[in-house]
């Protein structure tokens, strides 16, 4: 491999925003936020959907609190249903 062209690989904590579940995985992402997890400090990456909240993996429907693009547009421009 050539030196200096590959991104740094590190362990990060991914946190599901819908359920609050956390898991450690390797990534090249470089988030600004950090978190204390299992006695060590890791960079934190927040995700809207993970295997903990996705209906395919859970087998049941869960409703996430995140607004979609249409709701954000309607809030911004004051449109009502």
Swiss-Prot record:
Keywords: Ribonucleoprotein, Ribosomal protein. It comes from the Bacteria. Pfam families: Ribosomal_L31. GO terms for molecular function: structural constituent of ribosome. One of its GO terms (cellular component) is ribosome. InterPro entries: Ribosomal_bL28/bL31-like_sf (IPR034704), Ribosomal_bL31 (IPR002150), Ribosomal_bL31_B (IPR027493), Ribosomal_bL31_sf (IPR042105). Disulfide bonds: none annotated. One of its GO terms (biological process) is translation. Part of the 50S ribosomal subunit. Belongs to the bacterial ribosomal protein bL31 family. Type B subfamily. PANTHER family: 50S RIBOSOMAL PROTEIN L31, CHLOROPLASTIC (PTHR33280), LARGE RIBOSOMAL SUBUNIT PROTEIN BL31C (PTHR33280:SF1). This is Large ribosomal subunit protein bL31B. It comes from Lactobacillus acidophilus (strain ATCC 700396 / NCK56 / N2 / NCFM). The lineage of its organism: Bacteria, Bacillati, Bacillota, Bacilli, Lactobacillales. The gene is rpmE2.
